[in-house]
Amino acid sequence: MAKLIVALDYTYASEALAMANILKKHVEWVKVGLELFTHEGPSIIQLLKRMGFKVMLDLKLFDIPNTVKGSVRSACLMDVDMLTLHILGGEHMIKAALNEVQSSIQKKSHSPLLFGVTILTSIKQGELPGYNQDIASMVLNLAAYGQQWGLHGIVCSGQELTKIKALYPSLSCLTPGIRMSYSQKDDQHRVMTPSEAVKAGSDFLVIGRPITQAEQPIKIVEDIISSIM
């Protein structure tokens, strides 16, 4: 069964922890993104882990190999369960990150799953100057590299899932841009409902505002889980 990851897209720890406290008996995974992590630092990870959550640290790392390697080492020390990085960072960057995870395993330390970002779900066709390929083709090419280089999984929109799973059935796929049929798209463009994404082959669904901005977030979580079972 696909896993639900609730995106705690807040600025302050107080807001994120308040929502986490509401959801802690109903959700296994939460996501900490760039805004919250930049404001609160590693302490927010520690607090969420103490509450019993598995934590996806969504920093979308994209830097020189040595810098990314050091960032992955820090994530391992924070007991992060999943970490994102851009596949466009290239083979040397990806393999430096994977080597650091392997080193953590050998030291019997905590080691996160590494998921490679393909193309952000907020990007529409024509918004990438200098790239002549259509978005779907770019995502498929990046997924191929992610598989080849040994990533644990990739991040892609629901619209590319079916083709990716047909080509790489063992590659885990994490899908952001998930919206309920009745909810707004917000700043997402390539979106899909939870049941559609699971039918297409998604292994992890990242959902934020449709849950965290709802009057009854637990009810929305229950509806989502029911729709993907």
Curated annotation (Swiss-Prot):
GO cellular component terms, semicolon-separated: cytosol
GO molecular function: orotidine-5'-phosphate decarboxylase activity
GO biological process, one term: 'de novo' UMP biosynthetic process
SUPFAM superfamilies: Ribulose-phoshate binding barrel
PANTHER family per record: OROTIDINE 5'-PHOSPHATE DECARBOXYLASE (PTHR32119:SF2)
Subunit description: Homodimer.
Protein name: Orotidine 5'-phosphate decarboxylase
Organism this protein belongs to: Lawsonia intracellularis (strain PHE/MN1-00)
Gene (name only): pyrF
